[in-house]
């Protein structure tokens, strides 16, 4: 596994429409790509990554919401200075790595939900985006087997966000022209300050 470079705006490759993974491409190279994508996403850290974000124009995306495991025993973190201050407990993260190859939304819901989205390719910029609250997705796994699944909540939103990447669309493209310009200006200022 290897951590790959994540493309950031204004890299023109992010506007590329990704190609489907062909039947003869379900092989060790694809498995390596997926492994690298997970490692890259976790290192960033993020909850979703499309192959085009690491420069590979294929219809592959990975998601792991990394939600707290509320069924597990809380773990202590921080440093206790003997006075009870500083140490606190948190729930360990429950990893649920998901792989979607050649995903296709076949039944988007008309009811919308709003999430504040961010993107590893548009670092440190967040904005509210409206998307269908639920959707049905058809996709393939690493073996090429086809699955169909109903998604809702953050998973549905994340999937739709990552699927936009496969079409060369960034979450800021859903914003008004003014909000998009403001976001890009803020990103430019942050880069100049760094």
Curated annotation (Swiss-Prot):
InterPro entries: Peptide_deformylase (IPR023635), Peptide_deformylase_sf (IPR036821). It catalyses: N-terminal N-formyl-L-methionyl-[peptide] + H2O = N-terminal L-methionyl-[peptide] + formate. The active site is at residue 162. CDD domains: Pep_deformylase. Residues 71-93 are annotated as: Disordered. It comes from Erythrobacter litoralis (strain HTCC2594). HAMAP family: Pep_deformylase. Keywords: Hydrolase, Iron, Metal-binding, Protein biosynthesis. Fe cation binds at residues 119, 161, 165. Removes the formyl group from the N-terminal Met of newly synthesized proteins. Requires at least a dipeptide for an efficient rate of reaction. N-terminal L-methionine is a prerequisite for activity but the enzyme has broad specificity at other positions. The keyword rRNA-binding does not apply. One of its GO terms (molecular function) is peptide deformylase activity. Its EC number is 3.5.1.88. Binds 1 Fe(2+) ion. SUPFAM superfamilies: Peptide deformylase. This is Peptide deformylase. Signal peptide: none annotated. Residues 76-93 have a biased composition (Basic and acidic residues). Belongs to the polypeptide deformylase family. Its cofactor is Fe(2+). One of its GO terms (biological process) is co-translational protein modification.
């Amino acid at each position: 596994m290897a951590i790959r470079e994540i493309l950031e705006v204004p890299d023109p490759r992010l506007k590329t429409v990704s190609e489907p993974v062909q039947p003869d491409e379900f092989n060790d190279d694809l498995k390596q790509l997926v492994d690298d994508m997970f490692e890259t996403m976790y290192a960033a850290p993020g909850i979703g990554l499309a192959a085009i974000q690491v420069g590979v124009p294929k219809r592959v995306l990975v998601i792991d919401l990394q939600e707290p495991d509320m069924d597990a025993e809380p773990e202590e973190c921080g440093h206790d200075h003997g006075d009870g201050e500083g140490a606190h407990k948190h729930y360990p993260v429950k990893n649920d790595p998901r792989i979607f190859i050649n995903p296709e939304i076949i039944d988007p819901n008309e009811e919308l939900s709003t999430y504040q989205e961010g993107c590893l390719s548009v670092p440190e910029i967040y904005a509210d985006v409206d998307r269908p609250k639920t959707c049905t997705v058809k996709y393939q796994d690493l073996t090429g087997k086809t699955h169909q699944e109903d998604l809702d909540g953050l998973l549905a939103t994340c999937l739709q966000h990552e699927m936009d990447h496969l079409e060369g669309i960034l979450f800021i493209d859903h914003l008004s022209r003014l909000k998009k310009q403001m976001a890009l200006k803020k990103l430019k200022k942050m880069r100049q300050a760094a």
